[in-house]
Structure formats: structure tokens, C-alpha cells
Amino acid sequence: MAPLWNCSLSSLLWFLSLSNAVSGGRVYPPKDLPVVGETTCGGHTYQYHGLAGYGIVPSDAVDKYGDTLGGIGSAIAVEQSSWQRKRDGSYEGIAWALPDRGWNTNGTLNVQARVQKLSLKLTLAPTASAENPSKPNLQIKYLDTILLTGPDGTPTTGIDADATGFISFPGFPPLPGATINGDGFGGAGPGGRRISLDCEGLALGRDGSFWVSDEYGPYVYKFSRRGRMLQAIQPPAAYLPRRNNTLSFSAASPPIYDPDQIPVPEDPECGRNNNQGFEALTISPDGKKLFVMLQSGMNQEGGPKKRNRKQARLLEYDISGRKQRYVHEYAVTLPTYVDYTEENPEKATLVASQSEIHYLPTGDLMILARDSGFGHGQSESRSVYRRADIISKSRRTTDIKSYQYDRVNGSIASSTGVLKAGIRPVEYCPFIDYNLASELAKFGLHNGGEQDRFLLNEKWESLALVPVDRRDRRHHKKHEYFLISFSDNDYITQNGRLNFGKFKYADQSGFNLETQALVFHLSL
């Protein structure tokens, strides 16, 4: 049997005490379903009924390879067939979580990409309130790990891709690759070259495979159930990062052993910006449509400046056959927020980059957009924009798939992020506010204020939708769902381990950031 957590004794005892605290008999939701928020998008009405759950993973938990179980909020996907309501009224299911490239506060490391298998148990807390807050009622247990490799079985790496050159395999596009010194952690080792992955999006294939989107390429990869790379999707040329008129996959994120390894110029002249690649990925329930989206606008159409990069692109692929087919492309105008730390009003309005998308039963997409630099472990604790919103395409939405926009340096917007005439983006509709104080208080959580374990983390980057059982539904004309969202803790801990447990670290911030998870109740 796989261990629950390999972590410090204090964290384990604390976690088990919470599990016991929220267990119990059958629970019943209130008769009247409250409406905390509502939006209409693409002709569909969506209602938010409140925060239904909260869970954590200790910052020093490790997987079966002895590595810190961090970064798992980068993406999650739930096996829909596993999600069931138990006789006691609780819900259980299997989730897969995707860490990004590893702890990189002091530089990127030779961390092998992986997917983490988790079990989830949600025990409803219908009486939770600000006056009587519930303890964490979402139990998250670690089950297993699958390591990701290249087509030849060579482990992947989180080290920044080389500024020039790439790795080649028959039947694959040029792949981002890193030349590794020593063991890739600052010690002695064999070196070599590996495919660079900064994983950010995850979807489950109907054949048991894993679809993964990454920021370095930006590419989409398909891996077997055992973790071997089977396929790579290269986006149109406009997306590919270029420096000095040459393909350049580096994200200007030098390795820990060579902090001066910065490409020139630092920012790509066109294509995806550094660390703003394919942040979001989702697949339709029938397994035929794949959607992937950039975190923000490309450098030839508003990037890299945060106040201009609001025109992001959304790609749609047909994956029903043996080979994927690029079919549609759309513009998504991202929301903005006012950075209250900026003294210059002309520079204070910034783009809320998106961190995830999720296919909805209506055919619309949910999109997670947020500010950055605010939350637990940051210099400022109060976030002003952290939402799960809705985007909807219609017959009036412009399909921008064309040579004009997809060629090298092809642009849909000006350098200040203004869309070109004639382009109609998808409809964008604000929906669930993560920062709503009245809902957070039900679980003793808060946005802004003290830097304690109940302060929301900065980076919320994942979405997964699961159904509410018909016995618990209170909305007769709509379908009800739980929306599960994990935060990315960036592997920040004072008791960290990587390189199969051999590399020990303590983040210089002094913080221990638990992975936080929220569960929202909604209907559509």
C-alpha cells in the first residue's frame, strides 16, 4: 500500500487529526440553495452557491521517490468514473496532479517531470460559517507517482532549455533541450542532454494517456500511462520563441549551478514570452477536442509588459484520429486589475494572466485568471483579482486561424495590446471570486492581513469539475457541480528534498507553504 505522507511527524499527526475531525455521519445540505454569484455567458446562466470545501497538503510531504510533493497545483485532473458519493454522504475520487519544473527560487534544477496520483475525500460541511468555521473537509492522500521520459526513455528535466539548438527524434518537431552539467543540482554527475519541460496543463486521455502542456516550447505532449512521450504538438510558428531570428526555447531561467546563463536578448523578440507559455489545457468529455491557451499575449502583440499583454490566444485541435489536426484559433482578451503597490497611476493597471482552462458541459470554457505577487509568502498579502471566469465562443467570434496571424511574427494586436480591426474575441464573463471574505470565513481562511497558514496562497493554477450527486442537489432545473482548485506552492518549504531525496534545500524566504485546495459549489 502506498504511504499517506512521508513527511515530518508533526505534519502527519496534524493531518490525521483534521481527517478525524471532519469525518462523521451523513450530512444534508440546506433546503434553499444560496446564490453567492451569477453570470450569463454565451446564453448560459451560471450560479455560484458558495465555498464547499478546503484541504491542504503539508509543505514537507514527499512522494515515493523521496522528492518534495510540491507544485502539484499547476494542474489537476479527476478520473470522472472514480467520483462517487458514499453512504455516509461523503464523496471520493481519484485525481492526478501535475507539478511544474521544481523548486527554482535559486535557479532551475534537474528535476524529472512527473504526475502524482492522489485520492480525494470531500465531507460536506453545510453548517460552516464565519462564527463556526469548519476544519479542512477535503482529505488529500498521496497514492503514486509516474515519472515522465522522452520517446527513448531518457528522463526529462526542469532545467531551462538551451538558448540555441534542440533535441530531435523521428516523427517529432524540434524539442526544447537542456545541456546539463554534472548531476544538474550543482554536484558531480554524468551531465548529458534532456528534453526540458515546465509542465502547466494536464488532461486525461480516454485511452489512459496523459496530455501535458508546457511553457518552454510552448508545446503539448502526449505520454503513455507509464510516462513515455508518444507525441508532441508544435503550435503555429507565431507562438515559437525566437531570438536573433532563430528558434530559442530558453525562458531566461538559468540553472542553479550557473546563474549567469542568460540568453541575449533576455526576452524573445517574438513568440511566447518567458514563463508565459501553454499554461492551460483541457479536453472535451468525448475526448475529441483539445484546447490549449497561452498564459498571456505574445511578445509581438503586447508582451512582455504586464500592462499590455492582454490578448492571449486559444487553440483548438481535433484529436479524434491517430494524428492531431489544428482546426480553430481564437483571441481571448484577458481582464485587468489595479496594482495598489504601484505609485504611478499610468503603470498601475496590469493584465491578470490566466492559469488554467476547463471544458464545461455547456461547451463554454472556465478560465482561471489572477493577479501575481500577492498572498501567503509574498511581500503583500492582499490579492485583488483571483477568479474562475467563463469564456464563450459563438458564430460571431473571429476564427483567427490563418497564415497572416500564424506565421513567424504574426500579430493579432499592437505592441500595446490593442486588437486589430475586425477581430472579435470570445465573450469573457467574470464568475467566481476566490477572495470573497464571507465565503473564506466558513473555513477560517482570509485574503490579505496576517502572513499565517490561513492566508490564501498566491498562485492558484488548476481546475477540475465533478458532479454533485442527485441526492444532494437542491436546484431542480440545473445541474450542480463541485469545482476543485489547487494552489501551486512553488515547492517552498524549509524541509525540501529533490533528486530522489539526495538534494536537500530550505527556501530562503523562511516560509513553509502548504498546498491549499478549495472546493466551490456551482450550477449551470
What residue spans do the PLM features occupy?
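Fungal secretory targeting signals
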Residues: 1-24
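Sequence/structural signature of beta-propeller domains
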Residues: 22-524
